[in-house]
Amino acid sequence: MDARVFQSYSARAEGMKNPIAKELLALMEEKQSNLSVAVDLTKKSEILELVDKIGPYVCVIKTHIDVVEDFDQDMVEKLVALGKKHRFLIFEDRKFADIGNTVKLQYASGVYKIASWAHITNCHTVPGEGIIQGLKEVGLPLGRGLLLLAEMSSKGSLATGSYTEKTLEWFEKHTDFCFGFIAGRRFPNLQSDYITMSPGIGLDVKGDGLGQQYRTPEEVIVNCGSDIIIVGRGVYGAGRNPVVEAKRYREAGWKAYQQRLSQH
């Protein structure tokens, strides 16, 4: 495995070109958290209430802003304020997938104005390298960062093989704006260091019947070299106490990171 993953997050921060990557790695070390929670709720009040509860235990809050039924600018302002209060970054999981000029408008404009408040967003690379360039023209001057979807955790995903290889190639050309990947593992042989965020993490279940396949924090961080675990329903699903579960996943993720460091 790439020797850089056996360095601490704070040591790796120094080698990152993107300012959000530097901030994120330093924040993770400071909070002792490599947990990102995917807040896929549809009501503004429920989202803000949950984020305020779990904010102290996460490094990143991941949103799907287009599923919020009562979205408004006040929600954005309150979410940003909670990020400052609890010291986490906001990742809008937009998965852009259009040509460069269109994604520029989707990122900067429209109802959501994503670039104005989300530190991090992501994209598919199906349209070609132009999608990265388009998003970069908006996000780089604002000090934002982009994750590329090199793989997906759902069963039967087509994001494999040559698709993944081309994505890695384009990443290397844009490390001022791109700082990592949404993927289930760390990729070998990349010249630049980067952050890997892995979805599909669960401590209690192995799947959801809709194609989602779950793995443990230890599997993805120790065995696969990932850096951040993304957990959703495992934290706030029916019958769960979000604070208790956020603490549990944070501890499991951090323990796995410490185990990885001890191997070198």
Curated annotation (Swiss-Prot):
Q: Which Gene3D superfamilies match?
A: Aldolase class I
InterPro entries with a match to the protein in the record: Aldolase_TIM (IPR013785), OMPdecase (IPR014732), OMPdecase_AS (IPR018089), OMPdeCOase_dom (IPR001754), RibuloseP-bd_barrel (IPR011060)
Q: Where is the active site?
A: K95 (proton donor)
Matching entries from PROSITE patterns are given as: OMPDECASE (PS00156)
**Keywords of the record:** Decarboxylase, Lyase, Pyrimidine biosynthesis
What are the BP-aspect GO terms? Answer: 'de novo' pyrimidine nucleobase biosynthetic process; 'de novo' UMP biosynthetic process
Keyword Lyase attributed: yes
Q: What is catalysed by this protein?
A: orotidine 5'-phosphate + H(+) = UMP + CO2
Instruction: Report the enzyme's class at the first EC level.
Output: lyase
Question: What EC number(s) would the UniProt record show?
Answer: 4.1.1.23
Named from the GO MF annotations, one term is: orotidine-5'-phosphate decarboxylase activity
Domain of life, per the record? Eukaryota
**Which pathway or pathways does this protein act in?**
Pyrimidine metabolism; UMP biosynthesis via de novo pathway; UMP from orotate: step 2/2
Q: Which Pfam families match?
A: OMPdecase (PF00215)
SMART domains according to UniProt: OMPdecase
| Residue positions binding substrate | 40, 62-64, 93-102, 214, 233
Cellular component GO terms, alphabetical: cytosol; nucleus; protein aggregate center
Q: Which family does it belong to?
A: Belongs to the OMP decarboxylase family.
From the Swiss-Prot or TrEMBL record, give the protein name: Orotidine 5'-phosphate decarboxylase
Gene giving rise to this polypeptide: ura4
